[in-house]
Amino acid sequence: MSNDPTHQFLVNKIVPLEIGGIDFSFTNASLFMVATVGAAAGFLYLTTSQRGLIPTRMQSVSEMSYEFIASMLREGAGSHGMKFFPMVFSLFMFILTANLLGMVPYFFTVTSQIIVTFALAVFVIGTVLLYGFYKHGFGFLKLFVPQGVPGALLPLVVAIEIISFLSRPISLSVRLFANMLAGHITLKVFAGFVASLSAFGALGIGGAILPLIMTVALTGLEFLVAFLQAYVFAVLTCMYLNDAVHPGGH
């Protein structure tokens, strides 16, 4: 099983618990979600609790993360969208921390689970719907009626807009899930090549050099992907929130 590249994604029960026929077991996925929240919160607290006039490197990282998301949200949803800053910043930090923790050997990558990424995506779209109807009432439905569309094409365009909106949770969740899943499987496969070829002695070690170089390169790429996927999720969240704030703006 250790050579199976998909074995790292198995969800195992740590504390079995069933109530009324519903499984509430505490799993390795649950453990690392708690660890992700703790790591992100702990990092931000430790780096900002004793802020100095001259920031330390870690304090600078925290402040840059804050400004990065604030600027992204301001550009994506305008000044009125800044009320969603805590939500977008929390999502970004959770996904980024989860992705980075998943790079540690023997750790579990929670963002490689479609149920986790889908829950995050549904939370985002649910927030868009709730705020959109709360703020604009039925005027929120203008989101599905683009300006300047000829009357004859309007029914078709509205149908396309509705389908596009309903597909957002799927595309948002699958993008993150698929990238993390594929990246970790690829790393596992190349690492397996290195281990297998090294077992053949000197000749095998020579043959393992290329897979080893590829593994190191892919590891560096995965760290980049870990940030990019958190960034993409945050950018799309800002774009979707803009639809809730300005439903007639497209």
UniProtKB/Swiss-Prot annotation:
Which domain of life does this protein belong to? Bacteria
Q: Which controlled-vocabulary keywords does the entry list?
A: ATP synthesis, Cell inner membrane, Cell membrane, CF(0), Hydrogen ion transport, Ion transport, Membrane, Transmembrane, Transmembrane helix, Transport
Topologically, how does it sit relative to the membrane? Multi-pass membrane protein
Is Transport included in the keywords of this UniProt record? yes
Q: Name one GO molecular function term.
A: proton-transporting ATP synthase activity, rotational mechanism
- Note one Pfam family from the annotation: ATP-synt_A
InterPro entries per the UniProt record, alphabetical: ATP_synth_F0_asu, ATP_synth_F0_asu_AS, ATP_synth_F0_asu_bact/mt, F0_ATP_A_sf
Which cellular compartments is it found in?
Cell inner membrane
Show the coiled coil region(s). Answer: none
Q: Where are the transmembrane segments?
A: 26-46, 84-104, 114-134, 143-163, 193-213, 216-236
A GO CC annotation given for this chain: proton-transporting ATP synthase complex
Q: Which Gene3D superfamilies match?
A: ATP synthase, F0 complex, subunit A (1.20.120.220)
Q: Does the keyword Plastid apply?
A: no
Q: How does it assemble?
A: F-type ATPases have 2 components, CF(1) - the catalytic core - and CF(0) - the membrane proton channel. CF(1) has five subunits: alpha(3), beta(3), gamma(1), delta(1), epsilon(1). CF(0) has three main subunits: a(1), b(2) and c(9-12). The alpha and beta chains form an alternating ring which encloses part of the gamma chain. CF(1) is attached to CF(0) by a central stalk formed by the gamma and epsilon chains, while a peripheral stalk is formed by the delta and b chains.
* HAMAP family on file: ATP_synth_a_bact
Which family does the record assign?
Answer: Belongs to the ATPase A chain family.
Q: What is the annotated role of this protein in its UniProt record?
A: Key component of the proton channel; it plays a direct role in the translocation of protons across the membrane.
The protein depicted here goes by the name: ATP synthase subunit a
Source organism per entry reads Rhizobium meliloti (strain 1021) (Ensifer meliloti)
Q: Which gene encodes it?
A: atpB
